[in-house]
Amino acid sequence: VIKQQICAFTTRHGYKFTDGKNYWTKKHLKWLKELPLEGVNKETLDSYLLSYETVSDRIDQMNKRIEEIAETDKYREAVHKLICLKSVKVLTALAVIVEIGDFTRFVKAKNFAAFLGLVAGELSSGDQNQTGITKQGNTFLRKLLVECAQSFSRASSGKSEALKKRQEGTTPEVIAYADKANERLRKRYMCLVLHNRKNHNKATVAAARELACFIWGMMTGNIHTVLA
């Protein structure tokens, strides 16, 4: 919200950042602080920037704490497995692990996807015509995985340096599973958009559903059957 307020404020006063493509970088923040504003306008922007810095510092502290929790004996191994997946970072991995607990209570991957509300519903009992996803189950995790799946719309083949670093210290078997899953999800999204002419939202939800299945496979040790 504070970012939107700052952008709206500068636009309203005729200022547009043109020295780079990315906002909220050091260069962008320096530009904001040096805008030639006076009086109440200067005070307003300074107040916005102070709020932004306060929120940013708080987020940094929380992220650091999350990293610390993820490295405890209780969560380390599971977290390190999940972050081998391209779109899954520490926060998402820890959230999924804490929310679900025992993944083996789901007999199959599709049961886990259904728990998250990521499977298609039916118009009526006995009717095979399918509607959109049910949106039943764990809303928080469903939204989290859909957000993760957004990354496949801009994913390229290959492996980024950041992903390689996240995969360090993990077994070759887990890395191989994650790599195959990452490529399959990328191709799945592209196929739905380019060949099946699905819109971005539908393709993203489909990718999120498969991502949920891969997460189930990773957490239950079924890393061969899910990709079969």
Model-flagged regions — what are they?
Residues 1-81, 168-171, 178:
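Glycine-rich, often acidic, oxyanion-interacting loops/wings at catalytic, nucleic-acid
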